[in-house]
Amino acid sequence: MQQEALSFLSSSLPSLHHNFPSLSRLRFNNFPALSFKPNTSSSSSSFFKSPDIPSLSSTTTTTTTTETLESSIHEKLIYLDSLGIDFLTLINRHPPLLSTALSAVESVVDYMTTPPINFTLQDFRRLVSMCPELLTSPLTSHTIPVITFLLREVGVDSIFDLRQALRRRPRLLACSVDHQLRPTLYFLQRIGILDPHKHTYLLSCSVDNKLVPRIDYFEKLGFSRRSATAMFKRFPQLFNYSIAENYEPKLKYLMVEMGRDVREVLEFPQYFSFSLENRIKPRHEACAAKGVRFPLPVMLKTNEAGFRDTLEVCCDSSPPLKTSRLVTVQKDS
């Protein structure tokens, strides 16, 4: 299995705005151009035909529409600016905000910043900066159903926990309950994650494009489907890590530089949560210099002072007690 995993890793390759004009350019030139058409008739009454000039009523209607639109945009700019939200930055990232009625925007702001939801303005600004769709999503047919789903179906315990979940993953507010959130919830429950309220950040992830491919990756390393799934059940945060930027380099270091069995990550999938450069490599090199090999949890989970103390105790001439966690430590010959 180790050779199969190494072969797979060595052959794998790393995988890897809307620009909207400023307000000063928001003008509409809908006036038809004057036309000049020579009269080819032989009639002597007129050599030239009079230019086609738009009627006064058409010009007035166009002007009124333009002025109304600009007035609406200006009102939204002033309103959002009063909340500390940069309107021009938002429309550059999310142009539909331009055509959203001010009353609809105000309704969303009121709902999210007053009881029972009761986000502070600072928190609300952060939500909007990360999820501008919040301001343009229909309140009654989208935003409220998302909130209701999180509280009733996912089992988020309280409004406080709801705010925490949305602070951590504002994109939840842009997701469809029927097409995104509920299918992902069912998938997580099906693989044995029975406390989804603790992992709401995963609900915005695509099952087909993100969750399943990560389980498949460990199957290709030689793990059974059951073992790979159990690893994600034990440590659901593993779904959030990149295959190319996290799994692959850390597994290569584990097997090639550390000389460990790939199956160690089955029991300690938290291995992938530690920085390769700042934690894994320095700890391994310190152990190698002393000629010892710790279990991965002992090597990585303790703070720096605790790790150094453990290393010194292990290298002492007196053996550890049988009840000590160091009894599993292997000393390299």
Curated annotation (Swiss-Prot):
One of its GO terms (cellular component) is chloroplast nucleoid. SMART domains: Mterf. It is found in: Plastid, Chloroplast stroma; Plastid, Chloroplast stroma, Chloroplast nucleoid. Residues 38-67 are annotated as: Disordered. The keyword Repressor does not apply. GO terms for molecular function: double-stranded DNA binding; plastid PEP RNA polymerase core enzyme binding. Signal peptide: none annotated. The keyword Membrane does not apply. Keywords: Chloroplast, Plastid, Transcription, Transcription regulation, Transcription termination, Transit peptide. It comes from the Eukaryota. GO terms for biological process: DNA-templated transcription termination; embryonic morphogenesis; plastid gene expression; regulation of DNA-templated transcription. Disruption phenotype: Embryo lethal arrested at the globular stage. Seedling-lethal with albino phenotype due to defects in chloroplast development, photosystem assembly, and associated with an accumulation of photosynthetic proteins. Its main location: plastid. Expressed in green aerial tissues such as cotyledons, leaves, flowers and siliques, but not in roots. PANTHER family: CGI-12 PROTEIN-RELATED, OS03G0360600 PROTEIN. Belongs to the mTERF family. Self-interacts. Associates with the plastid-encoded RNA polymerase (PEP) complex. Interacts directly with PTAC7/PAP12, PTAC12/HMR/PAP5 and PTAC14/PAP7. Transcription termination factor required for chloroplast gene expression and protein synthesis in chloroplasts. Necessary for chloroplast photosynthetic complexes assembly by modulating the accumulation of photosynthetic proteins. Essential for embryogenesis. This is Protein SEEDLING LETHAL 1, chloroplastic. It comes from Arabidopsis thaliana. The gene is SL1.
